[in-house]
Amino acid sequence: MARFVVVPLLVLVSLFGLEAIQHPPKIQVYSRYPADNGKPNFLNCYVSGFHPSDIEVDLLKNGKKIEKVEHSDLSFSKDWSFYLLYYTEFTPNEKDEYACRVSHVTFSTPKTVKWDRNM
């Protein structure tokens, strides 16, 4: 009988322990195809390895939020950390600057990562 009480208690303690663990997101910004000025492409922001799941991701053009952005469903890895992909169509050129801005409880201020067209 004691075994049936201890096991559920251990499960509850484990679950509450997961909520206390915080991991900052890894942010990767890249284009689907190699950058070619004037040719349509997709800008991607892959955010991974974060916990808890509450996160805000914005794609930026010249520091301003891009409104027409799509994203994958929130998913989790074997280690219970989360990941997401945000993406939008764009046409690269020499003058515009693109970036991904992420807000998460592990950051004191939002973190912005610029797109490097040479990556």
Swiss-Prot record:
Residues 1-20 form the signal peptide. The keyword GTP-binding does not apply. InterPro entries: B2Microglobulin, Ig-like_dom, Ig-like_dom_sf, Ig-like_fold, Ig/MHC_CS, Ig_C1-set, MHC/Immunoglobulin. It comes from the Eukaryota. Residues 25-114 form the Ig-like C1-type domain. GO terms for biological process: antigen processing and presentation of peptide antigen via MHC class I; immune response. Keywords: Disulfide bond, Immunity, Immunoglobulin domain, MHC I, Secreted, Signal. It is found in: Secreted. GO terms for cellular component: extracellular region; MHC class I protein complex. The keyword Membrane does not apply. SMART domains: IGc1 (SM00407). Disulfide bonds join 45-100. Component of the class I major histocompatibility complex (MHC). Involved in the presentation of peptide antigens to the immune system. Belongs to the beta-2-microglobulin family. Heterodimer of an alpha chain and a beta chain. Beta-2-microglobulin is the beta-chain of major histocompatibility complex class I molecules. This is Beta-2-microglobulin. The lineage of its organism: Eukaryota, Metazoa, Chordata, Craniata, Vertebrata.
